[in-house]
């Protein structure tokens, strides 16, 4: 029996990160977490490229451009969508998650969903580096594992 499992080795891999500027005080923490994870696992600064977009809704377009370029072993999407008083949250959260999943399937480049979708600002703060860990760190670890797994299954 052959078992495939991605390793947590970022050395020699290239990573693209798309970060939403909206809710930047949260997304900066997610980015810090992602960079920490990548570097802890062996990625070099020159192997990481970051693209800032205005909001979460714009993440899929730039993530798609990055994935289609084939310059990256994985792309990490980071953002924070926080529920307000209108249905806007539902539209943005749904479209971003669907868009990111579609890009991975269409390009066969792992595009990792590191977009927080929370009911409150407090929930976002917790998930961006306090008690709930850092979802940016977790997204980067997933990217490393998936990049290695994709290489192994070729």
Swiss-Prot record:
Active-site residues per Swiss-Prot or TrEMBL entry: 88 (proton donor)
Binding, (2S)-2-hydroxy-3-oxobutyl phosphate: 85-86, 127
CDD domains (UniProt xref): Lumazine_synthase-I (cd09209)
One Gene Ontology cellular component: cytosol
The protein's name in its UniProt record: 6,7-dimethyl-8-ribityllumazine synthase
EC assignment: 2.5.1.78
Signal peptide positions (record): none
Gene that encodes it: ribH
Reaction(s) catalysed (UniProt annotation): (2S)-2-hydroxy-3-oxobutyl phosphate + 5-amino-6-(D-ribitylamino)uracil = 6,7-dimethyl-8-(1-D-ribityl)lumazine + phosphate + 2 H2O + H(+)
Pathway connected to this protein: Cofactor biosynthesis; riboflavin biosynthesis; riboflavin from 2-hydroxy-3-oxobutyl phosphate and 5-amino-6-(D-ribitylamino)uracil: step 1/2
A GO term for molecular function: 6,7-dimethyl-8-ribityllumazine synthase activity
Function of the molecule: Catalyzes the formation of 6,7-dimethyl-8-ribityllumazine by condensation of 5-amino-6-(D-ribitylamino)uracil with 3,4-dihydroxy-2-butanone 4-phosphate. This is the penultimate step in the biosynthesis of riboflavin.
GO biological process: riboflavin biosynthetic process
Top-level division of the source organism's lineage: Bacteria
Record family assignment: Belongs to the DMRL synthase family.
Key words of the record: Riboflavin biosynthesis, Transferase
Pfam families xref list: DMRL_synthase
Keyword Transport (UniProt): no
Binding site for 5-amino-6-(D-ribitylamino)uracil: 22, 56-58, 80-82, 113
